[in-house]
Amino acid sequence: MESGKPRKVKGLLGDELAWADFLISKASLVLASAVLFAAVFQLAVAFKGLEAQEELDFLARDFKAAVDNVGADNFPGKTQEISYRFDENEVFLASQFGEDIEVYVSGEYVHLKAESGGVNFSAVRPFTFRVLPFNEAELRGKLYARFGNDGSEKSPLSVDFQEIIEFLRVSGTEEALLSADEDISIKKEFVYIRGSEEVSAFEYVLVYQ
């Protein structure tokens, strides 16, 4: 009987070790699954964020293209005007942002801001042509207040071209906030300047609501 006891204890110890190994393996499997799930979740979040950024980039490019197209139209002395709506764009309607996209326009760029899932997104695209973020009445008013004439065909400016350009550049640096769910006017206008022999004109694209 004495000789059988050690074998029984040894058998119990073996069972306990096997059970411990099983629990450790089970815990390792659960931990590995949790790590894998976390990795997949992070990958999904990263992909969703990348998709959101691509949507905002597309909308910024599309708006820039609309402004640049008006600037590129070549009908000397004639104004061009279109209306642009973000909420008529399929990407805008299907985007993760809903209608919560802020549209900022300055004389140099369009800047879109949006938020999705607690993350802020931003997209900036520079304009190709000279742009001003206000309407024609404001343009004429600013020119008249500064130079005494409003720069229209009937009231051309009689100052240095570079002085006018610099004045309007500074005037257009402040961003204007536009509503994405309303018409945005994009209009080409001309500023007339009187030279020593003739009156000439240069173009601006006005972006406003």
What is each of the regions a protein language model found here?
Residues 38-209:
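Long, compositionally biased, intrinsically disordered regions
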